[in-house]
C-alpha cells in the first residue's frame, strides 16, 4: 500500500522542472503552512493553504513588477525577520521570474554591518532590497542601496498593474535562489541553487528518510538557512504536506515548547542542531512527569555541528518514553552548497554505540550525491578505508559555482569536478561517513595535528561548572617568532567575576584537559562574555572570526585582567615548605622535575606538577636520598598522599609508628564532585597502572585499590572472599552510598565483579561496572601454573620482556631456583625499564609472590550470580589466551553475558592487553571509557 502511494506521488511530481511549477502543483493538495506569532505575549497560529500562498505570491509578484529599474536579470535581496514574510516574498520574486537572494541577520557591529551591506551590493550587482518598514534603520541610511520597504509597495502600487508570471518558464538548469554563506572565513559568498538541483535534492531527502504525503513538517530556523528552505519548506511542498513554523526565540526561551509542538501537530519530520538537542534533553530530564505523544515522529534531523553520541542516546531514551517507536535522531552532513543535508545516518545511536564512537556517524549519501575521502599526505590519491582525509562531494545536488566570484569557485573544486568541502573525515567499513573536524579548524603543534572540535568536546565533556556549555572555542595562535602554532582556548564563564576560586578551578581543569590530549598546555586562555561570541542560527561560532579578534588584540584587556586575577589567587593560595620533611620533599621535586622551588605549592597534587606513573618510583628513590635520617619509604605513602605536604606529614608519622593497611589509594581527589571511580588492581596487586587513566578525569574523584602485602608487616589475603569483603567495606568508607562506579583491570575484573555483587546485595546501586579485558571464567587460565609461570607473566606485564621471550625462556626458567630465576629475568630483560620501575630481584620477587597468592586464591573460582550492569573493554589478547580479538571477544569475554541482568556493552579499545593502559594507548582508551561512563549516567 505504502509502495503504491510513493510510486504514484513520484510520478505526479516527476515532470516538475522548476519551483513555480512545484508551488502550482502543491496548491492542488490539501497541504498548507501554519505560522506561529506572539501578540500581546500570547502565542497564536495562523494557517494558509498552498493555494492561498500561490494567490498571495501572485499578487505580491505584481507589486514587485512595478518597481522601476528592474530587468530580467535583477536580483531581489529579501531581508525580513519573520519566516512568513520571507516565504511570501520569496515566492513572489520566484513567480515573477526574478532571482531571489535571502539575506542573513545583520551583526550588531555597525562597521562590520556596513562592510557587509556594501559587499553584497557589489557582489549581487546592485540588487533591489525588499524589507519591512521596521527594519529599514538596520541599513544605516546607505544611499547606494536600492532599498524598498514592502509596506510602501503595498500602499503605492497601481491596483491594475499587469505582470507576466515568467517563473513557470524557468528551466531546470536556471538558478532558483541565491543563498548566502555565513561569511565565517571572510565576506559572505552567494551560492546559486538551481531549480533542478533543488528538486533532485528534496526528492533525494524524501527517498532517504521515507517521508510520505501527509507527514507534518516543523521548522524553527530562519529561512536564510538552507536547511529551513530545503529540509523543511520545499520538502513539505513536494509532498503536499503541512508545515509548521515558529520563531527560534520561542524555543530557546523554553525548549519544552519544541516537544509540545511536535505533539500538538503530530510532527513527522523536523530539525535541531546538537546544542538544542542538549537543551531538550535537559528539559525532559528535569521534568520527568512531562507527557507527550510523539508516535508520529519519523526523523529528527540534526546538523551544523557534531552530534555527541551520549546526548543522542539519552535523548532517544527520553523520546521513547513519550511514544517514539524507532531511532529518529538523524545526524547529517550538509552545506549551503549541497542544498543542506545530503548525507545522513539512519541508525543513531545504536550504530555509534556499537562502534564506540564519541561523535555520531553521519551515514550515507542521499540519491543525487556521492562522496570520497582524499589523502592529505598524497594529494590526488584516495585515502585508504578508515584513513582520515579531505571530504569531497559531487553529483546533481551539488552546486557548480559561487555567484560573481571566480576565485572562490576555482579554489572550491578539484580538476575532475569534485567540490572540496573543507571537512576532514573518514569512511568506515560499512560505508558511513565520520567527520574529524574542518581543515581550517586544525591546530598543528610541533608537527602534530589536533582537531578543534575534539578539544572543545573534551573540555565540555568534563562538565566544568565554571563555563557555559557550547560557548567553548579552541583556535590556533602563533606568537611572533614562534616555531610552531600554539593552542588558545576561549570560553564563556558561568562563575561570577568576583568568584576567584571558581575562575582558578576552571582554568586548571581546561588547562589539564588540553594538556592530557596534546601534551601541551594552552598558551592563551580567555574568559569572554557571551555577547562577544556570536552564534549562527545553528549555534555555530566562527573560529576564524574568534582567531582574528584574538590576534588583533580585541580580547587583550580581558586577557590581561584574567591573568592578573589568576596570578594574585595563586599567590594567595600558595603554601611554602615549613617543616624539614616538607623541605626535603620540595627539594626532591625541584631536582626531579627541574622546576623552581617557588613553583611547588605544598597543597598541589604531585600529578598536576608533572609526576606520572612511570616516574613515581624514581621520585621515591630521589626522595629517599634527600631524607635525613634515612628511612625506607613505601610507595603507598606517595600514592595515598598525593601532595607534597601530605607526603611530608605521612613520612613524619611513619617515623614514629607503623601505618595500618589501607586499600584505598586516592589518585584524583577533586573538589568538583561527580561519582567517584574505584579501580581494582590487576593480578600484580599494584595500582600504578591506573595513574595515567586517573589523569583523564580532571573533575572526577578517582581511587585505586591495592592489595595487601606490599607494606611492611602486611599479610597477604587468605581468600577471594576476604579480599572482596575488605574492598567493599573500604569503598563504602570513602563513599557510603551509591551509585557506584567500579572498574577492574585484567584479573581485577573478577574482584570488581564480586565487589559489585556484595554492594548490590547490601541494597546499593552499582551504576557502572567495567571489566577491562578479562573474561569471567579464569580458573583454567591459572590452575596449572606455578610461581615460575607467574614470574614470567609479571615480567611480561611490566614490559621487562616481550611475549616472544616469555614463550622461549619458559622451559629453561622452570629448571632454576627462585633467586636464579629472578636474576635471569633481570639479566635478559629491558634494563632501562627495570631502572625506571626501580625493580630489583627483591621487588620483582615480592610482586610475583603477591600475584602467585592471587593465583592460588582463584584457581578453583567459579563465577556465580549476576550484576545489574556491565561494560567490557576489549583489547588484542595474548596469544596464549585466544586466537585473535574476534575469538577473545566472542568466545571468552562474551561469556560475561551470562552474569548480567541487563545487556552487556562491549567496547573495542586500542592496543594489546598488557599495554592498553600505557601512555601510547591511554588517550584512546580513556575516550572510549569515559563515553561508556556517560552512557551509564555516571
Curated annotation (Swiss-Prot):
Region spans: Thiolation and peptide carrier (T) domain: 581-652
Pathway: Secondary metabolite biosynthesis
GO molecular function: CoA-ligase activity; phosphopantetheine binding; transferase activity
Keyword Phosphoprotein (UniProt): yes
Carrier domain: residues covered: 579-655
Chain segments carrying region Adenylation (A) domain: 44-445
Record-linked PROSITE patterns: AMP_BINDING (PS00455), CARRIER (PS50075), PHOSPHOPANTETHEINE (PS00012)
Modified residues (O-(pantetheine 4'-phosphoryl)serine): 613
SUPFAM superfamilies: Acetyl-CoA synthetase-like, ACP-like, alpha/beta-Hydrolases
Residue ranges of the region described as Thioesterase (TE) domain: 676-923
Keywords: Phosphopantetheine, Phosphoprotein, Transferase
Keyword Transmembrane: no
Known EC number: 2.3.1.-
PANTHER family xrefs: LONG-CHAIN-FATTY-ACID--COA LIGASE, MALONATE--COA LIGASE ACSF3, MITOCHONDRIAL
UniProt family annotation: Belongs to the ATP-dependent AMP-binding enzyme family.
Purpose of the protein: Microperfuranone synthase is the only protein required for the biosynthesis of the secondary metabolite microperfuranone from phenylpyruvic acid (PPA). Several steps for the microperfuranione biosynthesis have been proposed. These steps include the activation of PPA, by the micA adenylation (A) domain to AMP-phenylpyruvic acid followed by loading of the PPA unit to the thiolation and peptide carrier (T) domain and eventually transferring to the thioesterase (TE) domain.
Stated name of the protein: Microperfuranone synthase
Species of provenance: Emericella nidulans (strain FGSC A4 / ATCC 38163 / CBS 112.46 / NRRL 194 / M139) (Aspergillus nidulans)
Amino acid at each position: 500500500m505504502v509502495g503504491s502511494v510513493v510510486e504514484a506521488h513520484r510520478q505526479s511530481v516527476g515532470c516538475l522542472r522548476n519551483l513555480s511549477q512545484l508551488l502550482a502543483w502543491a496548491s492542488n493538495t490539501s497541504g498548507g503552512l501554519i505560522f506561529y506569532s506572539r501578540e500581546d505575549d500570547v502565542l497564536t497560529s495562523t494557517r494558509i493553504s498552498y493555494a492561498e500562498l500561490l494567490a498571495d505570491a501572485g499578487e505580491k509578484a505584481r507589486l514587485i513588477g512595478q518597481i522601476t529599474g528592474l530587468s530580467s536579470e535583477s536580483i531581489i535581496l529579501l531581508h525580513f525577520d519573520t519566516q512568513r514574510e520571507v516565504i511570501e516574498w520569496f515566492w513572489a520574486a520566484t513567480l515573477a521570474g526574478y532571482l531571489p537572494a535571502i539575506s542573513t541577520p545583520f551583526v550588531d557591529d555597525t562597521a562590520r554591518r556596513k562592510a557587509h551591506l556594501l559587499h553584497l551590493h557589489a557582489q549581487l550587482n546592485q540588487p533591489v532590497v525588499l524589507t519591512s518598514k521596521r527594519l529599514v534603520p538596520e541599513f544605516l541610511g546607505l544611499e547606494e542601496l536600492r532599498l524598498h520597504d514592502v509596506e510602501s509597495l503595498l500602499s503605492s502600487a497601481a491596483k491594475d498593474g499587469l505582470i507576466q508570471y515568467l517563473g513557470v518558464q524557468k528551466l531546470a538548469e536556471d538558478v532558483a535562489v541565491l543563498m548566502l554563506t555565513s561569511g565565517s572565513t571572510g565576506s559572505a559568498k552567494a551560492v546559486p541553487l538551481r531549480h533542478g538541483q533543488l528538486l533532485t535534492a528534496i526528492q533525494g531527502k524524501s527517498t532517504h528518510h521515507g517521508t510520505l504525503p501527509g507527514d507534518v513538517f516543523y521548522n524553527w530556523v530562519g529561512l536564510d538557512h538552507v536547511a529551513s528552505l530545503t529540509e523543511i519548506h520545499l520538502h513539505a511542498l513536494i509532498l503536499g504536506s503541512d508545515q509548521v513554523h515558529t520563531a527560534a526565540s520561542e524555543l530557546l526561551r523554553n525548549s519544552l515548547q519544541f516537544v509540545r509542538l511536535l505533539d500538538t501537530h503530530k510532527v513527522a519530520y523536523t530539525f535541531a542542531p546538537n546544542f538544542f538537542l542538549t537543551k531538550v534533553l535537559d528539559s525532559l530530564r528535569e521534568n520527568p512527569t512531562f507527557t507527550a505523544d510523539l508516535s508520529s515522529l519519523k526523523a529528527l534531523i540534526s546538523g551544523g555541528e557534531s552530534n555527541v553520541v551520549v546526548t543522542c542516546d539519552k535523548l532517544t531514551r527520553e523520546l521513547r518514553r513519550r511514544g517514539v517507536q524507532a531511532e529518529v535522531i538523524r545526524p547529517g552532513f550538509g552545506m549551503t552548497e549541497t542544498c543542506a543535508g545530503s548525507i545522513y545516518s539512519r541508525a543513531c545511536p545504536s550504530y555509534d554505540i556499537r562502534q564506540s564512537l564519541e561523535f555520531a556517524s553521519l551515514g550515507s549519501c542521499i540519491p543525487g550525491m556521492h562522496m570520497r575521502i582524499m589523502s592529505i599526505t598524497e594529494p590526488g590519491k584516495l585515502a585508504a578505508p578508515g584513513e582520515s582525509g579531505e571530504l569531497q562531494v559531487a553529483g546533481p545536488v551539488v552546486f557548480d559555482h559561487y555567484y560573481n566570484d571566480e576565485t572562490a569557485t576555482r579554489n572550491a573544486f578539484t580538476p575532475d569536478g569534485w567540490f572540496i568541502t573543507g571537512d576532514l573525515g573518514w569512511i568506515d567499513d560499512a560505508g558511513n561517513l565520520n567527520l574529524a573536524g574542518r581543515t581550517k579548524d586544525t591546530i598543528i603543534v610541533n608537527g602534530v595535528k589536533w582537531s578543534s572540535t575534539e578539544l572543545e568536546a573534551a573540555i565540555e565533556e568534563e562538565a566544568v561548572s565554571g563555563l557555559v556549555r557550547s560557548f567553548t572555542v579552541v583556535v590556533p595562535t602563533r606568537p611572533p617568532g614562534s616555531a610552531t602554532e600554539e593552542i588558545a582556548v576561549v570560553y564563556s564563564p558561568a562563575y561570577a567575576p568576583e568568584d576567584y576560586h571558581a575562575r582558578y578551578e576552571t582554568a586548571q581543569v581546561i588547562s589539564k584537559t588540553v594538556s592530557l590530549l596534546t601534551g601541551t598546555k594552552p598558551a592563551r586562555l580567555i574568559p569572554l562574555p557571551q555577547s562577544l561570541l556570536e552564534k549562527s542560527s545553528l549555534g555555530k561560532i566562527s573560529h576564524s572570526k574568534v582567531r582574528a579578534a584574538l590576534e588583533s588584540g580585541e580580547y587583550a584587556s580581558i586577557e590581561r585582567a584574567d591573568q592578573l586575577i589568576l596570578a594574585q589567587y595563586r599567590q594567595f593560595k600558595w603554601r611554602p615548605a615549613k617543616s624539614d620533611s616538607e623541605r626535603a620533599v620540595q627539594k626532591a621535586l625541584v631536582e626531579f622535575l627541574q622546576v623552581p622551588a617557588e613553583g611547588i605549592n605544598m597543597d598541589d597534587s604531585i600529578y598536576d606538577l608533572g609526576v606520572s606513573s612511570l616516574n613515581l618510583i624514581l621520585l621515591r628513590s630521589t626522595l629517599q636520598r634527600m631524607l635525613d635520617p634515612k628511612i625506607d619509604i613505601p610507595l603507598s605513602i606517595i600514592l595515598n598522599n598525593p601532595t607534597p605536604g601530605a607526603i611530608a606529614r605521612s613520612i613524619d608519622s611513619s617515623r614514629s609508628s607503623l601505618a595500618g593497611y589501607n586499600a584505598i589509594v586516592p589518585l584524583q581527589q577533586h573538589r568538583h564532585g561527580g561519582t567517584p571511580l574505584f579501580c581494582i588492581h590487576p593480578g600484580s596487586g599494584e595500582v600504578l597502572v591506573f595513574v595515567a587513566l586517573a589523569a583523564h578525569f580532571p573533575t572526577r574523584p578517582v581511587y585505586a585499590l591495592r592489595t595487601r602485602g606490599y607494606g611492611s608487616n602486611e599479610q597477604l589475603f587468605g581468600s577471594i572472599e576476604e579480599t572482596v569483603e575488605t574492598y567493599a567495606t573500604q569503598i563504602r568508607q570513602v563513599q557510603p552510598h551509591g551509585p557506584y562506579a567500579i572498574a577492574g583491570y585484567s584479573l581485577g575484573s573478577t574482584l570488581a565483579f564480586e565487589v559489585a555483587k556484595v554492594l548490590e546485595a547490601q541494597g546499593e546501586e552499582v551504576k557502572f561496572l567495567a571489566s577491562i579485558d578479562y573474561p569471567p571464567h579464569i580458573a583454567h587460565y591459572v590452575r596449572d601454573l606455578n610461581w615460575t609461570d607467574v614470574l614470567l607473566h609479571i615480567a611480561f606485564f611490566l614490559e621487562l620482556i616481550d611475549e616472544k621471550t616469555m614463550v622461549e625462556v619458559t622451559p629453561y626458567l622452570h629448571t632454576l631456583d627462585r633467586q636464579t630465576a629472578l636474576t635471569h629475568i633481570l639479566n635478559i630483560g629491558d634494563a632501562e625499564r627495570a631502572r625506571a620501575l626501580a625493580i630489583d630481584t627483591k621487588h620483582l620477587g615480592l610482586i610475583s609472590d603477591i600475584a602467585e597468592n592471587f593465583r592460588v586464591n582463584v584457581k578453583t573460582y567459579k563465577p556465580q550470580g549476576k550484576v545489574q550492569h556491565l561494560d567490557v573493554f576489549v583489547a588484542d589478547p595474548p596469544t596464549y589466551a585466544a586466537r585473535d580479538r574476534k575469538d577473545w571477544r566472542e568466545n571468552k569475554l562474551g561469556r560475561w553475558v551470562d552474569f548480567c541482568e541487563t545487556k552487556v556493552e562491549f567496547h573495542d579499545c586500542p592496543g594489546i592487553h598488557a599495554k592498553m593502559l600505557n601512555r601510547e594507548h591511554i588517550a584512546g582508551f580513556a575516550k572510549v571509557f569515559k563515553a561508556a561512563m556517560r552512557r551509564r549516567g555516571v
